[in-house]
Amino acid sequence: MVTIEQLFRQAQQAGAAEIYLMAGRKPAARIGGKIKNLDYPELSSTEAEKILLEMLDAKQAAQYRETKSVDEVIAFHGIGRFRVHIYQNDGVPSACVKIINKKEGLPEELKALAGITQGLVLVCGKPHSGKSATLAALAEQMLAGRFMHLVTLESPVEYPIEAGKGLLSRRCIGKDTGSYKEGMDNLLHESADGVLIGELETPEAVQAALRAVKMGLVVLGTVNSVDADTAVERIAQLSGMEAPLQKTRVWKMTKAVI
């Protein structure tokens, strides 16, 4: 039977961005923007369930049984890191796997953003455009240049970040803190100077981010959008603010959009 390590290694060597695993289908990968079958036989329902659920620990398996989906990041020595989303598909586990490529340093023209000490800094773009890698590189640049305490609230933790001169506390939702709100409630007790919230795609995450800005912190986050105006509009819609003032208030809080 095919192993996860074999699949992930082949897909990565082929330059894939994502891997798809479904019962009754050959393993597939998105390569150069197109989905292509990998050179493996179709997965039976039994094989799909076995190889996917074996990646979960007891807590994650319990979450999957309850909610029918779970996210995790796994690493294989000599291969790399992968963000795995396992979900139920016609009664059988399926998975979409994002290959976490090695992050590159922040481009020279963006390094000045590492000096921002208060307000919202958004990284926007389409899915698979490298938002998470850019966000991690920006956080690393901030920590390299000054003494600060940066707390991350992520679900799950994706890219490694070097603490540099600063202090870094990485908190995974569901593992290190119960929710974004709970993580935010603890920020003052942790004497944080900044917070990285991986994905600003839910009301809870957005409201946590805006609350941190009001506390005087610098807040880093990603938004699935094609441009700055759409990103701010998306944040405004999820903010819970009164409609007439939503967008104006969010723009005032926003220091930069990448």
What are the roles of these predicted feature ranges?
Residues 1-258:
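Short, flexible helix-loop junctions that flank or precede catalytic/ligand sites
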